[in-house]
């Protein structure tokens, strides 16, 4: 049984969030975010996913990922640095899209955790590769 969310430290909250994402447990991942949490993705104004997202638009992104990657999109955490409520994560994703194309991207996340919930998440990634595999039409 998992400890209550508020008893988890910032690193444990972040690791649990990305474990949920990797396992396709998107509702569980969203539950680890504060109700007013924001996510910012690099590339605002330059591709459809760039910019700020609330929980509703993040849910739409999760639905799109589930549709495009029916066998899941695995996220592997390579390194974590924690300073107070700030958690920096280096990670890599891997997934095979429904049409057989492979998506593998590198990320840096900067995450703020307060009271056991993620309040702010900033995502840096290769936006060209992400747009091609996440947003462009499938073959």
What is each of the regions a protein language model found here?
Residues 1-6, 63-139:
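A beta-strand edge to alpha-helix "cap/lid" segment located at domain peripheries
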Residues 1-32, 138-139:
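Short, low-complexity N-terminal intrinsically disordered segments enriched in polar/charged residues
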Residues 14, 18, 59-65, 134:
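A generic alpha-helix structural signal
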Residues 14-17, 29-30, 37, 58, ...:
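Hydrophobic pocket/interface hotspot
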Residues 34-83:
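A solvent-exposed, acidic/Ser-Thr-rich amphipathic alpha-helical stretch
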């Amino acid at each position: 049984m998992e400890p209550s969310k508020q008893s988890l430290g910032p690193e444990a909250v972040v690791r649990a969030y990305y474990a949920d994402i990797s396992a396709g447990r998107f509702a569980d991942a969203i539950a680890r975010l504060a109700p007013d949490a924001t996510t910012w993705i690099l590339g605002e104004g330059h591709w459809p996913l760039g910019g700020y997202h609330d929980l509703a638009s993040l849910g739409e992104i999760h639905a799109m990922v589930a549709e495009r990657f029916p066998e899941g999109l695995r996220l592997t955490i390579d390194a974590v640095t924690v300073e107070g409520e700030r958690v920096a994560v280096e990670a890599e994703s891997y997934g095979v899209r429904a049409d057989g194309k492979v998506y593998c991207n590198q990320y840096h996340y900067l995450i703020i955790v307060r009271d056991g919930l993620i309040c702010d998440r900033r995502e840096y990634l290769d936006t060209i590769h992400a747009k091609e595999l996440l947003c462009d039409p499938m073959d």
